[in-house]
């Protein structure tokens, strides 16, 4: 089983020396992945409900501070040599498809094949509108075309695509990514359509566990969701072994328990023994890569959380 760290790139950790220190420490501790969230701009008025809180309020909406995800991953790539670089997740409608394929491919080349592209359709309508993305109601269909275009651009000698949201032909797109046939694509999202997208397009399924409308915050719920992904993949003629089972436990908390929407203890919160049992239970149901939420408040708190997870959890599995 592999483990990783997820960070929002804002606040005290969004500083070059701090990011470099965190990345090198994560690599030294043996984490397999370092991932960053994706916001480009924050609207002055955010009315879109945040999927991962009961209230629907996004905890960072009062500040417009955020570093751009792909640029930050390029910076981290130059500071590290082993750890995989994860877009956790990249919101597909935020960027034009050809440019996105070029930027991600460039990171894969410069990192010598260490990029994993986690993708999602996004939740903040205002941000997608500000970035001149597709209509919010069309973002799922547009994202499917973008994903198809990414693979086409990454792999074909003479790429071309004709769709409703993406059209191109007559272009050269070199060099190709280091990873063959392309960097792994992990499909984020918890809803039924996201699970279907993972089955159709994904090299991995990468949900966040604490979506109140589609929770995977218990091993049983996660196992059921993964089974649905696998069943849909088989119907499409794919092998389930081609789909990595991931999870973002953004709510990880050692020492204090949180509750699910049913009043039960939320997985990956509580004592070290409870969290170890959670990891084992999820692993038994197919989980392969667990990414925990990092600590954004300051450098020392972030380093402490990584070291604590290594010594209190990983070393006892």
Enumerate the predicted regions with their spans.
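Active-site-adjacent structural elements that line small-molecule/cofactor binding pockets in enzymes
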Residues: 1-317
């Amino acid at each position: 089983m592999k483990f990783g760290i997820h960070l929002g790139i804002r606040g005290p950790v969004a500083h070059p020396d701090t990011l470099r220190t965190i990345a090198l420490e994560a690599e030294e501790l043996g984490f397999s992945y370092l991932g960053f969230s994706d916001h480009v701009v924050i609207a002055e008025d955010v009315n879109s409900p945040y999927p991962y809180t009961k209230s629907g309020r996004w905890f960072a909406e009062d500040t417009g501070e955020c570093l751009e995800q792909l640029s930050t991953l390029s910076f981290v790539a130059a500071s590290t040599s082993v750890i995989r670089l994860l877009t956790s997740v990249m919101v597909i409608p935020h960027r034009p498809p050809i440019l996105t394929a070029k930027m991600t491919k460039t990171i894969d080349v410069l990192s010598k094949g260490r990029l994993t592209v986690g993708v999602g359709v996004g939740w903040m309508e205002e941000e997608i509108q500000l970035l001149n993305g597709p209509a919010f109601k069309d973002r799922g269909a547009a994202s499917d075309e973008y994903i198809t275009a990414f693979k086409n651009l990454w792999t074909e000698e003479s790429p071309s695509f004709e769709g409703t949201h993406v059209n191109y032909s007559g272009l050269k797109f070199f060099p190709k990514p280091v990873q063959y046939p392309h960097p792994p694509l992990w499909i984020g999202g918890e809803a039924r359509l996201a699970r279907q997208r993972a089955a159709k397009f994904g090299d991995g399924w990468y949900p966040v566990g604490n979506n109140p409308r589609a929770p995977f915050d218990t091993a049983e719920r996660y196992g059921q969701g993964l089974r649905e992904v696998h069943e849909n993949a088989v119907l499409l003629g794919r092998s389930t072994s081609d789909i990595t089972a991931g999870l973002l436990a953004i709510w990880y908390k050692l020492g204090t328990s949180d509750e699910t929407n049913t009043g039960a203890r939320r997985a990956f919160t509580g004592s070290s023994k409870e969290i170890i049992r959670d990891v084992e239970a999820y692993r038994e149901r197919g989980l392969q890569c667990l990414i925990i939420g990092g600590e954004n408040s300051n450098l020392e708190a972030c380093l402490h959380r990584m070291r604590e997870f290594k010594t209190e959890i990983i070393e006892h599995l």
